[in-house]
From Swiss-Prot:
It is found in: Nucleus. PROSITE patterns: AP2_ERF (PS51032). GO terms for molecular function: DNA binding; DNA-binding transcription factor activity. It comes from Arabidopsis thaliana (Mouse-ear cress). GO terms for biological process: defense response; ethylene-activated signaling pathway. Belongs to the AP2/ERF transcription factor family. ERF subfamily. GO terms for cellular component: nucleus. A motif (EAR-like (transcriptional repression)) lies at residues 179-185. It holds the Pfam family AP2. This is Ethylene-responsive transcription factor 12.
Length: 189
């Protein structure tokens, strides 16, 4: 009898594979008792990172995540991202992901000071998609506790969450256009 082995895909917490191959990430908000849509991603790792960021934001250090906390990583042993000139000189595509640690942008003025204190989220970045070094002018995807205080550029969405605790160094993860084929087209198209 021939044994058949099926190559099983790695399954991440909070991530579902869509029939057309993209990966959806969502998390359950325990206070509102609703599911919060985090977006669709090209790879399961990007979706898992989005889930991990939301889980840490909602549940703090006791959150069950797919990957270890970036704050627990030894930052001295992380490889640095090569410059565009170095990548062009090597003519080799990079097949791994790189995390960038950056501070959130300044908070716009608002009359409701309770909701404007914290914005944080992940932005996934794949080195072969990068043409230049990380710039703080690029608009990442943020969580905010009030949609009135959030600003985003086209291609990025803002998701609201209640603030649990502050994070000393937010993790940003770059991703492509935030167009979800499950939703109607955005008004700016």
């Amino acid at each position: 009898m021939a044994s058949t082995t099926c190559a099983r895909e790695v399954h991440y917490r909070g991530v579902r594979k869509r029939p057309w191959g993209r990966y959806a990430a969502e998390i359950r908000d325990p206070w509102k008792k609703t599911r919060v849509w985090l977006g669709t991603f090209d790879t399961p790792e990007e979706a898992a990172l989005a889930y991990d960021g939301a889980a840490r934001f909602l549940r703090g250090i006791k959150a069950k995540t797919n990957f270890p906390s970036p704050l627990s990583l030894d930052l001295n042993h992380l490889p640095s991202a090569p410059s565009a000139a170095t990548a062009a000189a090597n003519n080799q595509p990079h097949q791994h992901q790189q995390l960038w640690f950056a501070a959130p942008p300044p908070v716009p003025p608002s009359s409701d000071h309770h909701h404007q204190h914290h914005r944080i989220f992940l932005r996934t970045g794949v080195l072969n998609d990068k043409t230049s070094d990380y710039s703080s002018t690029e608009a990442p995807l943020y969580f905010t506790s009030s949609p009135n205080t959030a600003t985003s550029s086209p291609g990025y969405q803002v998701v609201g969450f209640p603030m649990m605790n502050s994070s000393p160094s937010p993790v940003t993860v770059r991703r492509g256009l935030a167009i979800d084929l499950n939703e109607p087209p955005p008004l700016w198209l």
